[in-house]
Amino acid sequence: MVAIKNLFLLAATAVSVLAAPSPLDARATWTCINQQLNPKTNKWEDKRLLYSQAKAESNSHHAPLSDGKTGSSYPHWFTNGYDGNGKLIKGRTPIKFGKADCDRPPKHSQNGMGKDDHYLLEFPTFPDGHDYKFDSKKPKEDPGPARVIYTYPNKVFCGIVAHQRGNQGDLRLCSH
């Protein structure tokens, strides 16, 4: 009887551990802090933006598999501090995503479509999950502050990054 109770407790514990979402689980919510200009006060204010990983992954799957060859130039290469030969640019620190496909140095040919190319792409993603109009020319749709990062050519989800202020400047990994 004691053995059966212990077996039941072990099984219940295993089920609850397995049911908990992993950090890169599609059910994850990513939080990005972005400074946005308040039009009433004309001052920059921190905004907490929430992104669904499932919606961000969906955005990346709707994006064409190209590097800047659309009307909007998205998706395009996310250098992550590297040159096209996989050498780290002096003074740059790459973002660590915690996935081998995402963290390895890139190989990016001149046109971005070489047989052995592997690199990261960035594509706009939004809290409401709508798809970015990648073929919009001028005026192109506002890409917002956040980007879903994924691999070329196999579209492995790496994470969500965001600009710290508006939609300009360095990109930082959002928390999840």
Curated annotation (Swiss-Prot):
Protein name as annotated: Ribonuclease mitogillin
Function recorded in the entry: This purine-specific ribonuclease cleaves 28S RNA in eukaryotic ribosomes, inhibits protein synthesis, and shows antitumor activity.
EC number of this enzyme: 3.1.27.-
Cellular component aspect of the GO annotation: extracellular region
Claim: Nuclease is one of the keywords in the record: yes
Chief place where the protein resides: secreted
One matching Pfam family: Ribonuclease
SS bond list: 32-174, 102-158
Keyword Hydrolase: yes
GO molecular function: RNA binding; RNA endonuclease activity
Protein family according to the UniProt entry: Belongs to the ribonuclease U2 family.
Active-site residues annotated for this sequence: 76, 122 (proton acceptor), 163 (proton donor)
Signal peptide interval: 1-27
SUPFAM superfamilies linked: Microbial ribonucleases (SSF53933)
GO BP term, example: negative regulation of translation
Regions that span the bilayer: none
Enzyme class per UniProt: hydrolase
Species classification: Eukaryota, Fungi, Dikarya, Ascomycota, Pezizomycotina
This protein's UniProt keywords: Disulfide bond, Hydrolase, Nuclease, Protein synthesis inhibitor, Secreted, Signal
Cellular localisation: Secreted
